[in-house]
């Protein structure tokens, strides 16, 4: 029997990247998936791929910062599939990160919008999912955090704080609703080469980032999706309230770089001074 046979999952931010990989992974193991994304066309494309693989999915265009839209999302999931068993809170205000700066340079509108999506939106989804999970005898939630929620950075203040708060939200949910057979964990990815990230990085920067991974490769959305699927499944039935890093060892080593600059420490044989600066 497939791990998610008979289960209904809601995945937010599922039109691309990690969210899409999670939706596909759940569907491939028998789950019925509600694919939610701000970009409706991306959500439809994801459901089309699931359907092409003989899966069952429903696309919804919505903004998780909108409480009414979130309520409609879960009402639709219940009406269409009969309930909700699994939730992946992956949607994030990534479009704001170029303007998400150090504290004194930070536009408070960026802070407010980031918190509205990353934190409040996650809370809204959890509040809609929990009663429906209780009605079905329990469920599992994975909140998509980040390694940036576990260590300081020279910029992206709002994003990092929102992810740190998400970690505590996950622990609080696990504590408050474990008696109802609801598990909640956070997943903290490191450098994951999504299509969106690859489009922003030139070859030189890709080389620089790859050089500072402990493993001889970068992460991919499918790596994160495999972890998420495990945490949602009965294979992880005694795991709850945890923040699980999937970062290729990014946070396991020293030194870190307080100025955000480049290092020659990872220079490999054959690198010139110029390529080391890349």
From Swiss-Prot:
This is Uncharacterized short-chain type dehydrogenase/reductase y4lA. The keyword Nucleotide-binding does not apply. The keyword Oxidoreductase applies. PANTHER family: DEHYDROGENASES, SHORT CHAIN (PTHR24321), SHORT-CHAIN TYPE DEHYDROGENASE_REDUCTASE BLR2146-RELATED (PTHR24321:SF14). SMART domains: PKS_KR (SM00822). It comes from the Bacteria. One of its GO terms (molecular function) is oxidoreductase activity. Its EC number is 1.-.-.-. CDD domains: SDR_c12. Belongs to the short-chain dehydrogenases/reductases (SDR) family. Keywords: Oxidoreductase, Plasmid. It comes from Sinorhizobium fredii (strain NBRC 101917 / NGR234). The active site is at 159 (proton acceptor). NADP(+) binds at residues 10-34. Substrate binds at residue 146. InterPro entries: NAD(P)-bd_dom_sf, Sc_DH/Rdtase_CS, SDR_fam.
């Amino acid at each position: 029997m497939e791990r998610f046979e008979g289960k209904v999952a809601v995945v937010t931010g599922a039109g691309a990247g990690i969210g899409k990989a999670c939706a596909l992974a759940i569907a491939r193991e028998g789950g019925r998936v509600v694919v939610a994304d701000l970009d409706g066309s991306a959500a439809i494309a994801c459901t089309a791929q699931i359907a092409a693989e003989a899966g069952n999915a429903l696309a919804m265009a919505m903004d998780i910062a909108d409480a009414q839209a979130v309520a409609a999302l879960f009402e639709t999931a219940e009406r269409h599939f009969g309930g909700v068993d699994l939730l992946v809170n992956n949607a994030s205000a990534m479009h704001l990160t170029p303007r998400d700066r150090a504290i004194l340079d930070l536009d408070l509108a960026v802070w407010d919008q980031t918190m509205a999506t990353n934190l409040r939106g996650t809370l809204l989804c959890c509040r809609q999912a929990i009663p429906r999970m209780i009605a079905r005898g329990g469920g599992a939630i994975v909140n998509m955090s980040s390694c940036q929620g576990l260590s300081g950075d020279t910029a992206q203040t709002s994003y990092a704080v929102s992810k740190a708060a998400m970690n505590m939200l996950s622990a609080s949910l696990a504590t408050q609703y474990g008696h109802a057979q609801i598990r909640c964990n956070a997943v903290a990815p490191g450098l994951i080469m999504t299509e969106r990230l690859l489009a922003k990085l030139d070859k030189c920067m890709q080389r620089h980032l790859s050089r500072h991974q402990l493993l001889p490769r970068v992460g991919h959305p499918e790596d994160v999706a495999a972890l998420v699927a495990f945490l949602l499944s009965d294979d992880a039935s005694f795991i709850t309230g945890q923040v699980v890093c999937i970062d290729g060892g990014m946070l396991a080593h020293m030194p870190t770089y307080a100025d955000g600059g480049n290092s020659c420490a990872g220079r490999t044989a054959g690198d010139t001074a110029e390529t080391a600066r890349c």
